[in-house]
Amino acid sequence: MDGFVLPPGLIRPPGEAPAYDAWLAALPQAVAGLADRWSLRLGPPFLPGGSSAWVAPAATADGDPAVLKVGWVHDEAEHEADGLRAWDGRGTVRLLRAHRDGQTQALLLESCRPGVPLSDVLPGPEQDAVLAGLLRRLWITPPPGGVFRPLEAMCGAWVRRFEMDYGCARALGRDQVDPGVARAAMALFRELPAAAPDSVLLATDLHHGNVLASEREP
């Protein structure tokens, strides 16, 4: 793909993750193929970009604005398309199309305009109020089929990762958290999700920088 721009956020040290390196090498061809598949005219990607997806403004064959997101499939993004389908534009952009090919997940998204991050337009306490209201809107009953990972399983994985990292840090004399506090915190990580009375859909990467102003949604 001539003139392909690779955002710096996608660049990782060579050899750190061979499968990711292969995905990144094939990314220009994947983007070009998706532009043909969906008849898109692409603009330059948003910079500096994220750490696992190439994202750029696009125009459809009808001239409608959209956004193309071509991502590396990893645990945190495994069910991104499923979540957007379930929310169907309620508190989120709408999912227009999706295509999965191996470790590449492509999403054609509604363009969010003006797209200004919440963190850029409101002071901290007001940001928190907006975020809290959005959280409640996104807490919907998960659709049937059980495709989403339960929070209990996610927290269990985080606990195991923390315990491994914390054990290594203690062995090297670099631990900065009291062992009792660490044990209590990890116990809560295990217990609270298991005791939750209701099951709702969660956005696991929701923060002030990921909430954008939109003309369609307040």
Language-model segments: which ranges?
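A conserved alpha-helical element in kinase catalytic cores
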Residues: 28, 62-108, 116-138
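ATP phosphate-binding glycine-rich loop
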Residues: 52-58
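Protein kinase glycine-rich loop
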Residues: 44-49
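An alpha-helical support segment within catalytic cores of ATP-dependent transferases
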Residues: 26-31, 143-204, 214-216
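Active-site beta-strand-loop-beta-strand hairpin of nuclease catalytic cores
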Residues: 59-66, 214-218
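Juxta-kinase regulatory segment immediately upstream of eukaryotic protein kinase catalytic domains
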Residues: 1-42
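Hydrophobic residue at the +6 position relative to the catalytic HRD Asp in the kinase catalytic loop
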Residues: 209-211
